[in-house]
Swiss-Prot record:
The gene is mdfA. Monomer. It is a multi-pass membrane protein. This is Multidrug transporter MdfA. Its main location: membrane. The lineage of its organism: Bacteria, Pseudomonadati, Pseudomonadota, Gammaproteobacteria, Enterobacterales. GO terms for molecular function: sodium:proton antiporter activity.
Length: 410
């Protein structure tokens, strides 16, 4: 590709500054979802709203993450990745500060939706630029290592959020998110390369519809994108629902709630670290299959334990930790293969992939909320297991071609 930035041998400080600044922005948007969740109990109390608004905050945030993906990817193909990405960072800073003016839970939730739009820029623009900037082996390593930094958000978020809410108002969290994003803005402005290949082409809705139609007619791409959504949903549902499950349902403290996040997200990081070590020695296909075993075993353990005893939250945590390790091992390779399953420009493909995933997350978190409200931990984890089974079925379709991901070139 003519816009390749560097090979592994040429990866210098300037080249690395771009992914580091991108992951700082990603971190600020992710911690915007995770750190506020333990604080949501204080938010709903302040606005005199019911606890069912707690997971709805994340639902609104993820719905925002789906809202403009269809436009931003193709737009960045034509006017450039840099200006679109930088505009997204500025939008996040503004909406984080605007939430300080919210007067009720409805306004708060609307602003969470507007903040969530910032997620669109990561997948549709930022990660497309990463994929276009580095060769495959280097790219997968960077993606995995970037994921480790980004995953500190759900690891630290609940711990810091639970502690923060005891000493500082929840509004201060959003000032922190805006400050982190501001730092990433200056770094991206300095280091982000321009990798778009269709700059100057006219953007027409007719052509845009045609492009998406071609992408969505690709059965292998759709299977991969849906699989990524279903396999990640149990983790997102846990982040959204765990304050209610642990603090309200199990009557544990916010400190204990924070500690229960550590094994799950620690396992996720461990899976990513193992992936980074194995990438140059194993095929992408074998890494996905390897990760599939802990994914299914972990979800099965969590479901079986909580169906037998609804309050077996330690077994649930253990099962979700095993599952998270598998996610860390399998997902980066699956993202790569899915993105390149279509020959369409990567901005459009990445946007389509992100929209399908966000649709699954938005609907799925609401379903998981009602599953827990109606059937407790057992139904919540059975729902997670169903998502694992859907992922497994889609993987059979996606990897049906024995050559798919069966070389170190993907």
């Amino acid at each position: 590709m003519q816009n390749k930035l560097a090979s592994g041998a040429r990866l210098g400080r300037q080249a690395l500054l771009f992914p580091l600044c991108l992951v700082l922005y990603e971190f600020s948007t992710y911690i915007g979802a995770d750190m506020i969740q333990p604080g949501m109990l204080a938010v709903v109390e302040q606005y005199q709203a019911g606890i069912d608004w707690v997971p709805t905050s994340m639902t609104a945030y993820l719905a925002g993450g789906m809202f403009l993906q269809w436009l931003l990817g193709p737009l960045s193909d034509r006017i450039g990745r840099r200006p679109v990405m930088l505009a997204g960072v500025v939008w996040f800073i503004i909406t984080c500060l605007a939430i300080l003016l919210a007067q009720n839970i409805e306004q708060f939730t609307l602003l969470r939706f507007l903040q969530g739009i910032s997620l669109c820029f990561i997948g549709a623009v930022g990660y497309a630029a990463i994929q276009e900037s580095f060769e495959e082996a280097v790219c997968i390593k960077i993606t995995a290592l970037m994921a480790n930094v980004a995953l500190i958000a759900p690891l630290l978020g609940p711990l810091v959020g639970a502690a923060w809410i005891h000493v500082l108002p929840w509004e201060g969290m959003f000032v922190l998110f805006a400050a982190l994003a501001a730092i990433s803005f200056f770094g991206l402005q300095r280091a982000m390369p321009e990798t778009a290949t269709r700059i100057g082409e006219k953007l027409s809705l007719k052509e845009l519809g045609r492009d998406y139609k071609l992408v969505l007619k690709n059965g292998r791409f759709v299977a991969g994108a849906l699989a990524l959504g279903f396999v990640s949903l149990p983790l997102l549902a846990w982040i959204a629902q765990s304050p209610i499950i642990i603090i309200t349902g199990e009557q544990l403290s916010s400190y204990e709630y924070g500690l229960l996040q550590v094994p799950i997200f620690g396992a996720l990081i461990a899976g990513n670290l193992l992936l980074a070590r194995l990438t140059s020695r194993r095929t992408v296909r074998s890494l996905i299959i390897m990760g599939g075993w802990p994914i299914m075993i972990g979800l099965l353990v969590a479901a079986a334990a909580t169906v037998i005893s609804s309050h077996a939250y330690l077994w649930m945590t253990a099962g979700l930790s095993i599952y998270a390790f598998g996610i860390g091992l399998a997902n980066a390779g699956l993202v790569r293969l899915t993105l390149f399953a279509s020959d369409m420009s990567k901005g459009t493909v990445s946007a389509a992939m992100g929209m399908l995933q966000m649709l699954i997350f938005t609907v799925g978190i609401e379903i998981s909320k009602h599953a827990w409200l109606n059937g407790g931990n057992g139904q919540f984890n059975l729902f997670n297991l169903v998502n694992g089974i859907l992922w497994l079925s889609l993987m059979v379709i996606f990897l049906k071609d024995k050559q798919m991901g069966n070389s170190h070139e993907g």
